[in-house]
Design a protein with these regions (language model features):
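Residues within the helices of the helix-turn-helix
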Residues: 41, 279, 283
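Catalytic glycan-binding domains that act on GlcNAc-containing polysaccharides
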Residues: 1-215, 226-230, 235-250, 254-255, ...
Length: 331
């Protein structure tokens, strides 16, 4: 939805996840897992996707169908396909939406998100066309009104994105070593569990969810003072669903909470820089030859990467998290 794409970008991980992982979602998620137990079992045996993973997306996207967006799907996509800066992205979605209309899956009154996502798990028309399932066996695919259709369709899509059955996705870890090599964290620097253990990483569960040979990536969504996670290859499916770092770690942690894991340790992370300071930081990095992408005050992947590089250059703990202290040094 518009809200998930835009307003999440300015929040820190702890602030965003406090809002996203609330009591309403935790309580109703568990209730829904119980209520649709048989269907979740079918989804798991057919597609290998756990109920907790589907339910977390269902919660994050629409609060279990409560907030599905009120923008007319066909007219939104018609506009985006013709007037937008990325017609090559939206034209196929508009054609797919017309196909859905001809099949009776959506109609002229169908509403959803600004970019054409529809239904309780907010899927694009092309994905609904490919993966739409009739979960309640009433002869129709209705992702807006039928939770059963939404659950089974989400399972089919998540499976197609590459979900590995019976494998973990994320787990919280503890790092007590003050001299830990923080530059080893982040995307593209995965190593075996045995190697992380040697560096002093401990699972919050006491025992790691995967074997010593399994590769995982250390994620620090809010720097070395914030919560820490090891992400397994199934975490990549979250990034294919939504490429926001903060959204994906939150959705993965929410799925873990439904599986009985504890709330992450908040610790006392440094606050996120204000918009003004973030823009200042990006300008300084850019003028020093670092590629931050767009100077927009948003801590995206390229800005994090640039922060890490300059931290290494300055001999600081390289956790990719920009702080007031870093900005003062650069000033």
């Amino acid at each position: 939805s518009l809200d998930r794409r835009q307003s999440t970008f300015r929040l820190s991980f702890t602030d965003f996840s406090k809002k996203a992982i609330n009591n309403y979602r935790l309580k109703n998620g568990k209730k829904n897992i119980e209520k649709y137990k048989e269907l979740f079992q079918i989804a798991k045996s057919k597609y290998g996707v756990p109920p907790e993973v589907i339910t977390a997306f269902w919660a994050m996207e629409t609060d279990f169908g409560a907030v599905q967006g009120d923008i007319h799907t066909l007219s939104a996509l018609a506009t985006l396909a013709h007037d937008c800066r990325r017609p090559e992205m939206f034209q196929p979605e508009y054609i797919a939406a017309i196909n859905l209309f001809s099949k009776g899956i959506i109609d002229l009154k169908t509403t959803g998100a600004w970019a054409g996502e529809v239904g309780q798990v907010q899927m694009l028309p092309s994905d609904i066309l490919k993966f739409g399932k009739d979960g309640d066996n009433d002869g129709f695919i209705d992702l807006k009104k039928s939770p059963e259709d939404a659950i089974l369709t989400a399972a089919a899509l998540i499976s197609e994105l590459g979900w590995e059955p019976n494998q973990p996705w994320i787990e919280e870890v503890i790092i007590d070593d003050k001299n830990f090599p923080w530059k080893e964290a982040g995307f593209g620097r995965d190593r075996k569990i045995s190697s992380w253990k040697k560096l002093g990483i401990i699972s919050r569960n006491k025992k790691f969810m995967a074997s010593d040979n399994t590769k995982a990536t250390l994620l620090l969504p809010q720097g070395l003072k914030g919560p820490k996670f090891l992400a397994y290859s199934n975490y990549n499916i979250y990034l294919k669903w939504n490429d926001s770092f903060i959204y994906t770690v939150t959705a993965a942690h929410l799925a873990s909470r439904f599986s009985g894991q504890k709330k992450f340790l908040s610790n006392k992370p440094d606050k996120i820089l204000s918009l003004e300071k973030m823009i200042k930081l990006q300008n300084i990095l850019q003028s020093n030859g670092y590629n931050v992408g767009k100077v927009d005050g948003i801590l995206g992947r390229q800005t994090r990467q640039s922060v890490r590089s300059i931290q290494i250059k300055l001999g600081l703990p390289a956790d990719s998290w920009p702080t007031d202290d870093l900005l003062n040094i650069l000033n």
